[in-house]
């Protein structure tokens, strides 16, 4: 189930987003022990001028000041320690493979509760 959703402005120097998504999936699988088939990673590019921080907009993804926005969705049975490890694994992987400074990432984790997830045609309980 883990979902990792990444948003950024377009990069001035093109990145191989498909390859980065594969690497993040592999790194997260290795860090969490979760099989790759259960991990979903997406990357949405924001339109130039559609991301403001302190009222300042940018056309391209800067090295600082407009962090990449990452939202993780995990089942609520993970411990606080596991969640912290997973967040760090995503930060390390994204920074390394996308060549983005780790201090220019904002990662938020939300927890999905048993009975509040619909997948593969049915409600999921754990």
How would you name each of these model-derived features?
Residues 1-126:
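Interaction-mediating elements
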């Amino acid at each position: 189930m883990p979902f990792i959703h990444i948003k950024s402005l377009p990069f001035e120097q093109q990145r191989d987003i498909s390859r980065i998504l594969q690497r993040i999936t592999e790194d997260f699988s290795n860090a969490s022990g979760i099989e790759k088939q259960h991990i979903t990673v997406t990357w949405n590019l924001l339109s130039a001028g559609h991301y403001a921080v302190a009222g300042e907009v940018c056309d391209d993804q800067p090295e600082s000041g407009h962090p990449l926005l990452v939202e993780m969705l995990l089942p609520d049975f993970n411990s606080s320690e596991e969640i912290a490890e997973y967040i760090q694994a995503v930060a390390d992987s994204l920074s390394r493979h996308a060549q983005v400074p780790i201090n220019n990432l904002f990662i938020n984790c939300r927890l999905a509760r048993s009975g509040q997830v619909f997948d593969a045609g049915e409600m999921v309980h754990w």
